[in-house]
Amino acid sequence: MGKELYEQHALAKRLFDEANEILGFRITDIMFSGTDEDLKQTKVTQPAIFLHSVVHALCMGDEFQPDMVAGHSLGEFSALVANKVLSFQDGLRLVKTRAFAMQKACELRPSTMAAILNLEDAVV
């Protein structure tokens, strides 16, 4: 996840390396060669998704000229950074705080999520 960007773009490498410092752990190790179990931890998943989305947008440079941006939940942070309303660093710090808080909540009250596809409303 994101390894190709890291290897092919100097800006991506700089941002990924900066993310390792901001997060306090080597997210690149997990994103590029970690286990699914490591990546499924919300304290890793959320920064990884944010990082991949934002790095991709920022590496597009001047090619990325959106008329508008939108995001839902975690995607709101990516949208704000991609549209230069929020800095990469501040966006990642916010996502880190959010992710660690949600990780703690998950540990205090374990739960799970399921997707239900192709069933009639009455069946669900």
Regions found by a protein language model. Name each.
Residues 1-70, 119:
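Helix-rich "cap/lid" substructures immediately adjacent to catalytic or cofactor-binding pockets
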Residues 3, 41, 79, 112-115:
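Conserved short-loop catalytic and cofactor-binding motifs
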Residues 18, 52-55, 77, 90, ...:
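Residues within well-formed alpha-helices
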Residues 21-25, 83-124:
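Alpha/beta catalytic cores of group-transfer enzymes, especially the acyltransferase/condensing modules
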Residues 34-35, 73, 95-98:
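A general structural motif at alpha-helix termini
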Residues 37-41, 79, 83, 108:
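Short amphipathic alpha-helical segments at helix-loop
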Residues 72-81, 85-86:
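Glycine-rich nucleophile elbow surrounding the catalytic serine of serine-hydrolase chemistry
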